[in-house]
């Protein structure tokens, strides 16, 4: 029997209070971008994301006003990392209201890549850094002391992981150095990454290095690295990215390489483009007359303005452009021209600790328990955190899509 008085026949009646109605709200372009960039479960458009965020905010308010806990199935989860693939049973592994994506942090430095990748739905299970001063800064901020030289660590002693992160040393490929590539004494380090990938078979990896890696030895160095990564079965993608497109007032081009395990069936990946039309100028991050960073008149006269290989870049509070790349040897004024601030007791100074953090996208409360020399070296060797964070978000989103397709099979 169709229609009529049959129970449940006809169109479902939706209570007036539950009907969706068009409402107008005014928001900034910046807020719109933040909403659209937020990964929310089962939400694909702006309207759905707004509703989800509002519901979440209301639930959090209610939760804060009540002492009892809210049941798990009534909680809307907004998260960056949506899923992780269980190698043994092709299932989703859920812990602590979210997904725990395990990762290892190789050539960790002071933890810039970790800072960009880590969130409350990820867990670092292993880190390695050979430099004792960088390890000191790493431990001060993450509460764990990295293991030492990765070349001396057996891959069997490294925990299994979902993601391998590595900012392998860039000196052999840097435009500033001699561009020795595989002729450099650290040439074998990339092969340590390869042996760990081969043994542990993580779902994905993220590698970062200087742009010069692409052209070193007429491109042969990069081709060898790429061929070796692909020989392990991984789908490999790379892109030259610039920190100035990701909210930092610094021109800092780096090559980022990501790879996905063959079991995921991923054949495409789009790197985030950032916001090249809305760059942050250097004067936005300068602080007024910080003490202890002035360059003496003697050094200014002896080195800065008498070098044959160019003059330094001088900035002040009127400058609305992006500065040159911060390098590890920035503090060695007598060796390199660099960027200096027209400010301070002697009229010229180095970047302050706070400015270094802002240049690289580190939080202002990031601890720096080392000498001034080591501080400049460590930040100069680190990564543009917002850029890594954007790549990490794209990787997690692509992994989710692939895992959902696997689960449907």
Swiss-Prot record:
Keyword DNA-binding: yes
InterPro entries: C5-MTase, C5_DNA_meth_AS, C5_MeTfrase, C5_meth_CS, SAM-dependent_MTases_sf
Gene3D superfamilies named in the record: DNA Methylase, subunit A, domain 2, Vaccinia Virus protein VP39
EC numbers on record: 2.1.1.37
Active-site annotation: 170
MF terms in GO: DNA (cytosine-5-)-methyltransferase activity; DNA binding
Protein name (Swiss-Prot/TrEMBL): Type II methyltransferase M.BsuFI
Encoding gene per record: hsdFM
């Amino acid at each position: 029997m169709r229609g009529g008085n049959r129970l449940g026949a006809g169109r479902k009646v939706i209570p007036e209070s539950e009907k969706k109605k068009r409402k107008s709200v005014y928001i900034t372009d910046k807020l719109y971008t933040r909403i659209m960039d937020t990964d929310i479960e089962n939400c694909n458009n702006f309207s759905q994301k707004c509703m989800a965020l509002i519901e979440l905010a209301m639930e959090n308010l209610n939760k804060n006003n009540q002492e009892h806990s809210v049941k798990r199935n009534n909680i809307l989860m907004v998260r960056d990392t949506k899923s992780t693939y269980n190698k043994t049973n092709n299932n989703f592994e859920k812990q602590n209201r979210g997904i725990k994506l395990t990762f290892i942090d190789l050539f960790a430095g002071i933890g810039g890549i970790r800072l960009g990748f880590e969130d409350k739905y990820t867990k670092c299970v292993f880190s390695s850094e050979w430099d004792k001063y960088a390890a000191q800064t790493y431990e001060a901020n993450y509460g764990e002391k990295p293991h030492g030289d990765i070349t001396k660590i057996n891959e069997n002693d490294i925990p299994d992981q979902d993601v391998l992160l590595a900012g392998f040393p860039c000196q052999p490929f840097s435009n500033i150095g001699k561009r020795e590539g595989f002729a450099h004494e650290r040439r074998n380090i990339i092969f340590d990454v390869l042996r760990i990938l081969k043994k542990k078979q993580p779902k994905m990896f993220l590698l970062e290095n200087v742009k010069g890696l692409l052209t070193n030895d007429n491109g042969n160095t990069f081709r060898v690295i790429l061929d070796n990564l692909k020989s392990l079965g991984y789908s490999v993608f790379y892109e030259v990215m610039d920190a100035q497109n990701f909210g930092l007032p610094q021109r800092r081009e780096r090559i980022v390489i990501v790879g996905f395990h063959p079991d995921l069936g991923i054949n495409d990946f789009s790197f985030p483009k950032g916001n090249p039309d809305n760059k942050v100028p250097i004067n936005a991050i300068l602080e007024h007359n910080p003490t202890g960073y002035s360059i003496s008149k003697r050094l200014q006269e002896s080195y800065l303005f008498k070098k044959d290989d160019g003059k330094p870049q001088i900035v002040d509070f009127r400058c609305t452009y992006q500065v040159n790349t911060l390098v590890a040897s920035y503090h060695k004024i007598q060796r390199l021209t660099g960027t200096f601030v027209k400010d301070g007791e002697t009229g010229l100074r180095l970047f302050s600790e706070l400015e270094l953090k802002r240049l690289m996208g580190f939080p202002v409360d990031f601890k720096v328990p080392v000498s001034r020399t080591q501080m400049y070296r460590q930040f100069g060797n680190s990564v543009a955190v917002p850029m890594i964070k954007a790549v990490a978000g794209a990787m997690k989103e692509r992994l989710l899509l692939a895992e959902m397709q696997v689960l449907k099979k």
